[in-house]
Amino acid sequence: MRHNKKFNHLGRTASHRSAMLSNMACSLIKHKRITTTVAKAKALKKFVEPLITKSKEDTTNSRRVVFSNLQDKIAVTELFKEISVKIADRPGGYTRIIKTGNRLGDNAEMCFIELVDYNENMAKEKVAKKATRTRRSKKSAEAAAPAAVEAPATEEPKAESAE
């Protein structure tokens, strides 16, 4: 049975796990995207999202709470100065996990974990796809309209000749 197993231990002691998650969170905040295994990324997502939410209000207490988890002044400063401003209107879901396949050495499932608002490449692709879709739909709609007009005209004489 699965009672009282709320999080993945990742095969580590509690101190090792907390240190690893703290270091990974600092790397994510500094670099905006890191490559890791899927299990670690899911654990990191649970660890870092409440910290990002806490950074939305820039008070002394919230800075102390975040620093107690991260232990890195540069990461805390960047989180409160840059990231919290950029994600101010987002209600949650600050990170995204993108699976990249399996690692060659041990066949572990790998992925990127990144901050959602910092991936300009995906935002540009989405805009370009929308523009392409609207162009195609206009052309297909224009092509379908004349075909629809011609089709009833050809059907009417057939209906008259059949009667």
Swiss-Prot record:
Biological processes annotated in GO: translation
Bias type Basic residues, positions: 129-138
Cellular component GO terms held in the UniProt record: cytosolic large ribosomal subunit
GO molecular-function term, one example from the UniProt record: structural constituent of ribosome
Keyword Heme listed: no
UniProt-listed Pfam families: Ribosomal_L17 (PF01196)
Keyword terms: Ribonucleoprotein, Ribosomal protein
Region (Disordered) residue spans: 127-163
Domain of life where this protein originates: Bacteria
Ranges of biased composition (kind: Low complexity): 142-154
Keyword check for Ribonucleoprotein: yes
Family: Belongs to the bacterial ribosomal protein bL17 family.
Subunit text: Part of the 50S ribosomal subunit. Contacts protein L32.
Name under which the protein is recorded: Large ribosomal subunit protein bL17
